[in-house]
């Protein structure tokens, strides 16, 4: 709420490449607590509401917090890397962290069904793959005001942290682990 009514506060804590490169790395975390408006915040929190219980149920509360904040950092680091020469690049939102939780939930429960456009039921693993392919497109096109790079980095964070916490997934869901890794590998090949 404060960020919506206090531009100085908003600018002080947003993700800003120039400021981060000047030593204000704390912005890589604080930006995750700022949102452009109420709909931005509500969409992130609604996604968290649906997928956090899956992660908490499988990994526990502490590991959920680790996935959340780890994904926020992964999203910020990938954004830093991708936009490193654009000193004016700015971003806010918990989308990287939330996408990490989403990808963790998909990895933990790949057979759950999700609604594409909230209507068409598709398997979670397929949604995860399509979502990251769309994120790659958005990162390359750079024609909207969406933090695709943070989303992608957050998903990578959720994927990696979940596999570190639950390495047996490599055996139990080998095919899903490989399928969900395809867009991640694809991005780094395209770079």
Indicate residue ranges for each PLM-predicted region:
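A detector for small-residue-rich transmembrane helices and their helix-helix packing motifs
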Residues: 1-191
């Amino acid at each position: 709420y404060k960020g919506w009514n206090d531009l100085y506060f908003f600018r002080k804590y947003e993700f800003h490449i120039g400021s981060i490169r000047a030593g204000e790395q704390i912005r890589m975390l604080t930006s995750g607590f700022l949102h452009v408006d109420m709909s931005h915040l509500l969409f992130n929190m609604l996604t968290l509401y649906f997928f956090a219980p899956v992660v908490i149920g499988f990994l526990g509360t502490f590991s959920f917090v680790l996935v959340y904040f780890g994904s926020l950092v992964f999203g910020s680091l990938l954004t830093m890397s991708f936009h490193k020469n654009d000193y004016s690049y700015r971003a806010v939102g918990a989308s990287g962290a939330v996408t990490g939780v989403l990808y963790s939930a998909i990895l933990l429960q790949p057979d759950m069904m999700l609604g594409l456009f909230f209507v068409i039921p598709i398997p979670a693993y397929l949604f995860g793959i399509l979502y990251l392919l769309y994120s790659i497109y958005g990162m390359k096109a750079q024609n909207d005001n969406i933090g695709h790079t943070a989303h992608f980095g957050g998903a990578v964070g959720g994927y990696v942290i979940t596999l570190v916490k639950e390495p047996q997934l490599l055996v139990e869901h080998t095919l899903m682990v490989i399928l969900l890794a395809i867009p991640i590998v694809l991005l780094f090949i395209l770079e």
